[in-house]
UniProtKB/Swiss-Prot annotation:
Residues 71-94, 178-203, 381-413, 545-570 are annotated as: Disordered. The gene is Stau2. It comes from Mus musculus. Keywords: Cytoplasm, Endoplasmic reticulum, Microtubule, Nucleus, Phosphoprotein, Repeat, RNA-binding, Transport. InterPro entries: DRBM-containing_protein (IPR051740), dsRBD_dom (IPR014720), STAU2_DSRM_2 (IPR044464), STAU2_DSRM_3 (IPR044473), STAU2_DSRM_4 (IPR044474), Staufen_C (IPR032478). Residues 194-203 have a biased composition (Basic and acidic residues). A motif (Nuclear localization signal 2) lies at residues 373-412. Its main location: cytoplasm. GO terms for cellular component: axon; cytoplasmic stress granule; dendrite cytoplasm; dendritic shaft; endoplasmic reticulum; glutamatergic synapse; microtubule; neuronal cell body. GO terms for biological process: anterograde dendritic transport of messenger ribonucleoprotein complex; cellular response to oxidative stress; eye morphogenesis; positive regulation of dendritic spine morphogenesis; positive regulation of long-term synaptic depression; positive regulation of synapse assembly; regulation of actin cytoskeleton organization; regulation of filopodium assembly. Induction: Expression in extrasynaptic regions of muscle is induced by denervation. Expression in myoblasts is induced during differentiation into myotubes and by treatment with nerve derived trophic factors such as AGRN (agrin) and NRG1 (neuregulin). Residues 381-570 are annotated as: Required for dendritic transport. Residues 8-75, 95-181, 207-274, 307-375 form the DRBM domain. This is Double-stranded RNA-binding protein Staufen homolog 2. PANTHER family: DOUBLE-STRANDED RNA-BINDING PROTEIN STAUFEN HOMOLOG 2 (PTHR46054:SF1), MATERNAL EFFECT PROTEIN STAUFEN (PTHR46054).
Length: 570
């Protein structure tokens, strides 16, 4: 309601009920909705009629149902009394006396009210007490009237009223009507007098000692207080203090040092006030350079390299629009592989973003909104490796990032097509020929004729390599007996210990390499079967083979000769 004195619908319903001598009844029918936004349903019964209405509170529901009852009720309404006329014509709550006081202060003229005695009533009848004539001895009292005289500057006004306050208001009203249209008089006091009055007002609450120090400071004069005399008994001592202010000095006496100091300052202050006033020095006005307003950049190129969320918020602030509104739409995926979908709304524009967590999803949504609004992508300004301070020369896998997985078996090297073609070309350049190779220990159970085998040609080797690269297994290698191993060099590339073990197995005896080596280094012969020889005719041959195994063979030709000798011996 605009006017607080206006009656509410509930009040009007109560008046209507009193006019018809009935009792209104309000009933709370229903209460629904969440705790922060409930809705109340109220029923009003007025006589035989009922009305229902809802509101966000019980009071609002009552007001709504009462307003509905006033509109739809068929009961005759009482006649409204007219409002009382305001006797005071002055608008607002300000009385004429208060308004006159403000005007008098502006004019610099005080408003003085003086009450006046009322005029005596004239007695036109003499009480002669004639017989037979009607003479009223007791007259009715006449109404008393108060008079007030108002003086504002050189103007006088008179007011009258039934009370003294009414008389003051009447006089103030007359003064306002007369002085409102008159110009305000200008005062031009002398600068010296006004300055002295202002100084006196300022110095009213200061002590004499403080005033002495202020005057001495303004005139660059030294000040010193000194107790020159102390006399009297201990319980009634008297102190004399001398104060010196430049060329002026004075003495003061009192029963305490503080009192004597104050009296001395009062005496010297009277002499200091006689000095001529100091010339007024105008202080230069301080000039403050205005800082230029910070320019908020909201162009398409602004903010590249920033966080998209911060960049989008700054753009909205520069536009003086509402900040972006982020909403989590859904959360899907396995417990350890979640995927969040975040939506951002800027005005009428809507964009979404996904990510493994809410932070990345929010960032992607802000990036999508920036692109949708016509801004460039928020590219990073520097390499992430430079930020983390990692070694630039390290080309291995970065910590914290999973390596890409493949389904190929381990041990197979994947080559690019260019490298593979170069390998094939280099293999074809090698002249094809037959070379001798040594069999693996797994094939030692085969006959001695298979000890030296013919190696496959370069064409078959290329076929085996191609099958291993493509499929991981080589049927060709299994067919020719290589079993995935590469072609070997001649007999010279086989370790001497393997050769010794193979020859000992063929000859039918066992050899312990550690014992043989230990005894050979010490220059001793074995006692208890370090080397057990079943056939005495082969002892010299085994000793010869042992020496060949311990020494480094320098030439492949010597090895092939030994191999031939051992074969012929067998």
């Amino acid at each position: 309601m605009a006017n607080p004195k206006e009656k509410t619908p509930v009040c009007l319903v109560n008046e209507l009920a009193r006019f018809h001598s009935i009792q209104p009844q309000y009933k709370l029918l229903n209460e629904s909705g969440p705790a922060h936004s409930k809705m109340f349903s109220v029923q009003l019964s007025l006589g035989e009629q009922t009305w229902e209405s809802e509101g966000s509170s019980i009071k609002k529901a009552q007001q709504a149902v009462a307003n509905k009852a006033l509109t739809e009720s068929t009961l005759p309404k009482p006649v409204q009394k007219p409002p009382k006329s305001n006797v005071n014509n002055n608008p607002g709550s300000i009385t004429p006396t208060v308004e006159l006081n403000g005007l008098a202060m502006k004019r610099g003229e005080p408003a003085i009210y003086r009450p006046l005695d009322p005029k005596p009533f004239p007695n036109y009848r003499a009480n002669y007490n004639f017989r037979g004539m009607y003479n009223q001895r007791y007259h009715c009292p006449m109404p008393k009237i108060f008079y007030v005289q108002l003086t504002v500057g050189n103007n006088e006004f008179f007011g009258e009223g039934k009370t003294r306050q009414a008389a003051r208001h009447n006089a103030a009203m007359k003064a306002l009507q007369a002085l409102q249209n008159e110009p305000i008089p200008e005062k031009s006091p002398q600068n010296g007098e006004s300055g002295k009055e202002m100084d006196d007002d300022k110095d009213a609450n200061k002590s004499e000692i403080s005033l002495v120090f202020e005057i001495a400071l303004k005139r660059n004069m030294p000040v010193s207080f000194e107790v020159i005399k102390e006399s009297g008994p201990p319980h009634m001592k008297s102190f004399v203090t001398r104060v010196s202010v430049g060329e002026f000095s004075a003495e003061g006496e009192g029963n305490s040092k503080k009192l004597s100091k104050k009296r001395a300052a009062t005496t010297v202050l009277q002499e200091l006030k006689k000095l001529p006033p100091l010339p007024v020095v105008e202080k230069p006005k301080l000039f403050f350079k205005k800082r230029p307003k910070t320019i908020v950049k909201a162009g398409p190129d602004y903010g590249q390299g920033m966080n998209p969320i911060s960049r989008l918020a700054q753009i909205q602030q520069a536009r003086k629009e509402k900040e972006p509104d982020y909403i989590l739409l859904s959360e899907r995926g396995m417990p350890r592989r979640r995927e969040f979908v975040m939506q951002v709304k800027v005005g009428n524009e809507v964009a979404t973003g996904t990510g493994p967590n809410k932070k990345i999803a929010k960032k992607n949504a802000a990036e999508a909104m920036l692109l949708q609004l016509g801004y460039k992508a928020s590219t990073s300004l520097q390499d992430p490796l430079d930020k983390t301070g990692e070694n630039k020369g390290w080309s291995g896998p970065k910590p914290g990032f999973p390596e890409p997985t493949n389904n190929t078996p381990k041990g197979i090297l994947h080559l690019s097509p260019d490298v593979y073609q170069e390998m094939e070309a280099s293999r074809h350049r090698v002249t094809s020929g037959t070379t001798l190779s040594y069999l693996s220990p797994k094939d030692m159970n085969q006959p001695s004729s298979s000890f030296f085998s013919v190696s496959p040609s370069s064409t078959s080797s290329a076929t085996v390599a191609r099958e291993l690269l493509m499929n991981g297994t080589s049927p060709t290698a299994e067919a020719i007996g290589l079993k995935g191993s590469s072609p070997t060099s001649p007999c010279s590339s086989v370790q001497p210990s393997k050769q010794l073990e193979y020859l000992a197995r063929i000859q039918g005896f066992q050899a312990a390499l550690s014992a043989l080596k230990q005894f050979s280094e010490q220059g001793l012969e074995s006692i208890d079967g370090a080397v057990n020889v079943e056939k005495g005719s082969l002892e010299k041959q085994a000793k010869h083979l042992r020496e060949k195994a311990d020494n480094n063979q320098a030439k492949p030709a010597s090895i092939s000769q030994d191999c031939k000798k051992s074969k012929s011996a067998i």
